[in-house]
């Protein structure tokens, strides 16, 4: 199947499952899920496969490994809703655990879409390397950030930050936020 975009029916399914979040409703609408949600997401993964392979030839591209499951694990949560009202795709190096690995992601929800690159959870080793680079070569770090065109494309740098991390005196003000990032 060729990816032609996400149909309006994808978002409509997410809205419907939000308000009818039970197993009986899902089973009655499983065909809609397969057609309007799962098939477009799988086509999206296949469409992006060549680009992902050009970044890393060992990128995980099997749809069942890249696509989030609609069914939630509710064992340890107060919210026992069995289904998500959004889905995401993660592209990461095959065989790596999700936690701490570098990945590209895309999320579609009724409220909109998000996409980006980063890590899932903390990757202390990578962040320590970034901090050392900020101290040693702040202009080089600024140049890399500039080449990413973050501000021109309205992209945000997100993630949690250390609240009490001591930032060395030589770190420029515009890089202090980057230095304090946890992830």
Give the label of every model feature segment.
Residues 110-170:
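Compact, glycine/acidic-enriched structural inserts
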Residues 70, 88, 163-176:
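Aromatic/basic-lined ligand-recognition segments
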